[in-house]
Amino acid sequence: MKIFGKWDPTEVEVRDLGIKRYVSLTPVIVPHSSGKHARQQFNKSEISIVERLANNLMRTEINTGKKQKTLRAVEEAFDIVSKKTKQNPIQVLVDAIANAGPREEVVRLKYGGISVPKAVDTAPQRRVDTALRYISMGTNNAAFKSKRSVAECLATELIGAANRDTKSFAINRKDAKERVAKAAR
């Protein structure tokens, strides 16, 4: 069974062992589960990673609830990625998530009346969530008031994040977050 009838998720390899358990590559024709996993706290890791990307793209006010439109944009973006990189676009998505997820973050601890930043390791589930959020934010920011379509912007963001390109919004955000954490050690 192939996603969108084109790409086989079984040939995709998650190279980052930390997030392997949280990136679901279950083969589905149309990535639309109707929120079946919303009842349990951490069951979102069982939803297909392509559907989670589409759900994150629906965050802005004008796209809220327009899943078919978003899935069409994701499919077009995967076509563009496939043509540009000659790779399985799901593999590019997984590599982009692995590269865009921050490994270290900052928490604020209060000692007396003073708040002190402290660097902490990021949980794998949060790394995946944050990476998906950064990729979708970068896509929405690039497509807003632009002649480029959402699909083109998503394809550019995915390819940039998969290649660790600092022009990518997701990689830029991740580096900034890790830089702050390094300063707070």
Curated annotation (Swiss-Prot):
The keyword DNA damage does not apply. It holds the Pfam family Ribosomal_S7. It comes from the Archaea. One of its GO terms (molecular function) is structural constituent of ribosome. GO terms for biological process: translation. One of its GO terms (cellular component) is small ribosomal subunit. Keywords: Ribonucleoprotein, Ribosomal protein, RNA-binding, rRNA-binding. InterPro entries: Ribosomal_uS7, Ribosomal_uS7_arc, Ribosomal_uS7_dom, Ribosomal_uS7_dom_sf, Ribosomal_uS7_euk/arc. Part of the 30S ribosomal subunit. NCBIfam families: PRK04027.1 (NF003106), uS7_euk_arch (TIGR01028). One of the primary rRNA binding proteins, it binds directly to 16S rRNA where it nucleates assembly of the head domain of the 30S subunit. Is located at the subunit interface close to the decoding center. Belongs to the universal ribosomal protein uS7 family. This is Small ribosomal subunit protein uS7. It comes from Methanosarcina barkeri (strain Fusaro / DSM 804). The lineage of its organism: Archaea, Methanobacteriati, Methanobacteriota, Stenosarchaea group, Methanomicrobia.
